[in-house]
Amino acid sequence: MQVERVDFVSFLTQDLARARRFYTEVLGLEIETEGESDLELRAGQVTLDVFDPSSIGQPFAPSPAGVALRVADVDAARAELESKGVPFDGDTIVTGVCKQAWFKDPDGNALMLHRRFDV
């Protein structure tokens, strides 16, 4: 088997309308497709799928794993999101390879603003 690429990353939501507002109005992502129980958004070359698990009788649980959203300037992007009322989980982290700032969507799914130093 050879994996060609990641087609999408999925998050669960308890409120699709609220998730739509957050991902489009706050993060500025564009909707690719939208159904009754899910929403697919374009994030660069990856699709984020936001899905209401209650539509298939499954329980909700936020994802603590996190998705790194690459931005040109982590500090500027963080300031922009903070001005829109998005709280961050601690200070911006600088490692040997990147800068990152962690936050959550309204359902508690972990996200980070991210930039590698070599890119």
Where are the model-predicted features located?
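Amphipathic alpha-helical segments
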Residues: 15-30
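Short hydrophobic/aromatic beta-strand or adjacent loop that forms the aromatic wall/cage
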Residues: 36-38, 66, 98-100
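Short secondary-structure junctions
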Residues: 28-33, 88-92
